[in-house]
Amino acid sequence: MTAPAIHPSAVIESGARIGDGARIGPFCHVGPEVVLGADCELISHVVLAGRTTIGPRTRIFPFASIGHQPQDLKYRGEASTLTIGADCLIREGVTMNPGTSGGGLETLVGDHCTFLANSHVGHDCRVGAHVIFSNNVMLAGHCSVGDYAILGGGAAVIQFARVGAHAFVGGLSGLENDCIPYGMVLGNRAYLSGLNIIGLQRRGFAREDIHALRRAYRLLFAPEGTLMERVEDVAATFESHAAVAEILDFIRLGGKRSICTPREVPTPISAA
């Protein structure tokens, strides 16, 4: 075991629990209810507040503010938590807030996540593992983001929206509906522009699985019938395919937002 290395200018309040091998740089402030895991690093000027728990080997860069009270006007000081997983990278100016009584009193971030400069995780959010937030991504309260999702620079996600696993939200997109797993959304307001094929290839999905997802996508968003009717048709066609089932379960589960769909192609206007 290696004792924590704490710069003399850092303020570690009584009650804070600092793991073995942690490194806390100049002018950091760690609150009394913070739990900082083993081998974490706070480079400098990092603030950890509230009932915040951070997993081992997470690195946090200057001017990140983690665990201060939620940005929710209904918040009345109720005890709530923020839990961040292991091996995360949190860059300059990132903010993350704990939960509220309106959302389960906890905000959760999984392992191996990357949050680039000035990105934000709002109160009561659920962020999976291996998620990437590019610079200036804004995740409003009560949102969920699935494993391996990527949010491009400047993307904004409205309260209560869901982003499925392996999805891609394009830079500067404004997402006000739910993005299916493996989907790709673009624009303001964002529309479903297809599947995240490049992401699937990079993560080693088999060609036959990608082909099945493409076929299922075309059937799901065909013009005939209702979405739920098409869900059942796709379920019957791909009854043993796990990735397709994940999309269907996501749609069936539903949420407070609608499912993001492809943009309609305008009907050509006749010159006659």
Curated annotation (Swiss-Prot):
Q: Pfam families of this UniProt entry?
A: Acetyltransf_11 (PF13720), Hexapep (PF00132)
Q: What class of enzyme is it?
A: transferase
Provide the GO biological process annotations. lipid A biosynthetic process
Question: Which CDD domains does UniProt cross-reference here?
Answer: LbH_UDP-GlcNAc_AT (cd03351)
Q: What is its EC number?
A: 2.3.1.129
Where located? Answer: Cytoplasm
Q: Which GO terms describe its cellular component?
A: cytoplasm; membrane
Q: Which UniProt keywords apply?
A: Acyltransferase, Cytoplasm, Lipid A biosynthesis, Lipid biosynthesis, Lipid metabolism, Repeat, Transferase
Identify the HAMAP family for this entry: LpxA
Q: How does it assemble?
A: Homotrimer.
Protein's name according to its UniProt entry: Acyl-[acyl-carrier-protein]--UDP-N-acetylglucosamine O-acyltransferase
Q: Which organism is it from?
A: Methylobacterium radiotolerans (strain ATCC 27329 / DSM 1819 / JCM 2831 / NBRC 15690 / NCIMB 10815 / 0-1)
